[in-house]
Amino acid sequence: MLKQRELHECHVLYNLMTDPAVFPYVRYPCQSYEEYLFITKQLIVEEEQGTCISRTILDEIGHPIGTIDLYHIHHQTGFLATWIGAPYFGKGYNQRAKEAFLAELFLGHDIETIFLKIRTQNIRSKKAVEKLPYVTLANERYEQVYQSINHSQQRYNLYCVERSDFLESIGGIQHEVAT
């Protein structure tokens, strides 16, 4: 479901990203394929430097359908950014991608807290993240971070995933599956 980013996937991902239902909500809204290719190269370099972790989201047959990134990694925290192409909306990919990525981050990297900033008008993302049992609204708990993401005219809600909450949640999920 997730794999490291590769440049040969950029054509498919760029075409999915430019859909009007997706484009306003991506972290890097590129205006051209060449710009998207450049940004992807930068992300690969940043991952090598340890400042971000970026993955391609795949469907069941291995086609790229979106991306998921942890960026601004600092003091065991980072920000999560995810987008999925419109043809794949409502099919459970978002939740599965997040769970796989969070498991990788919390079990394979030294990450304790993951922040998600969601534009107040992005109802689709808000509903999707609030379905996840390990995500909490963090506007008050992390007020300084909340203030820092709301310094422009664009308004965001801040959510977070703590390592302990996620691991407890997936332990419960795994127990339910086993019984």
Where are these regions (language model features)?
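Conserved GNAT-fold acetyl-CoA-binding loop/helix
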Residues: 21-42
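Acyl-donor (CoA/ACP) binding surface of acyl/acetyltransferases
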Residues: 1-11, 15-21, 58-179
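A short hydrophobic/aromatic micro-motif that marks alpha-helical segments and, especially, helix-coil
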Residues: 24, 33-35, 47, 148, ...
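A generic secondary-structure signal
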Residues: 42-43, 104
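Sparse recognition of residues in long alpha-helices and their boundaries
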Residues: 29-30, 52, 145
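A short helix-loop-beta-strand connector motif used in the catalytic cores of GNAT acetyltransferases and
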Residues: 43-56, 66
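Generic alpha-helix structural propensity
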Residues: 8, 17, 35-38, 52
